[in-house]
Amino acid sequence: MFGLFIITAIAEILGCYFPYLILKEGKSAWLWLPTALSLAVFVWLLTLHPAASGRIYAAYGGIYIFTALMWLRFVDQVALTRWDILGGVIVLCGAGLIILQPQGLIR
C-alpha cells in the first residue's frame, strides 16, 4: 500500500509542478497537457486505495508530505533542515499509525 501512496503523491506533485513551470518559469503552455494527465492519474489512483476515503486522505497526507520533502531535496536540490526532517518523521509516524492499524478496528 505504501508504494501506491508514493505513486499517487508523485502524480499529484507533477500535476502541480507543471503549472508552476508554466506560470513561474515561463515554460511552454504545452505543459498543460501533462498537467491534466497527471491530475487525472492522481484521481484514478485515489480510487485504488482499499479503505474508506477519509482514512485514505488522512494517511495519504503524511505520505504526500514525505514525497514533497524528497522532491524538495532531489528535484529542487534544496538541503533539508532538521525541522524538515523532524516534521517528516512525525507525519510519517502518524500516517503509519493510520495505515497499519489492526484490521479489527476498521469498519
Swiss-Prot record:
Designated name of the protein: UPF0060 membrane protein A1S_1909
Q: Which PANTHER family match?
A: UPF0060 MEMBRANE PROTEIN YNFA
State the family it belongs to. Belongs to the UPF0060 family.
One GO CC annotation, please? plasma membrane
Answer yes or no on keyword Membrane.
yes
Where in the cell does this protein reside?
Answer: Cell inner membrane
Q: Where primarily located?
A: membrane
What organism is the protein native to? Acinetobacter baumannii (strain ATCC 17978 / DSM 105126 / CIP 53.77 / LMG 1025 / NCDC KC755 / 5377)
Q: Give the way it sits in the membrane.
A: Multi-pass membrane protein
One Pfam family assigned to this protein is UPF0060
What are the UniProt keywords, alphabetically?
Cell inner membrane, Cell membrane, Membrane, Transmembrane, Transmembrane helix
Q: Which InterPro entries does the entry mention? A: UPF0060
**Bilayer-crossing regions:** 2-22, 28-48, 56-76, 85-105
Q: Which HAMAP family match?
A: UPF0060
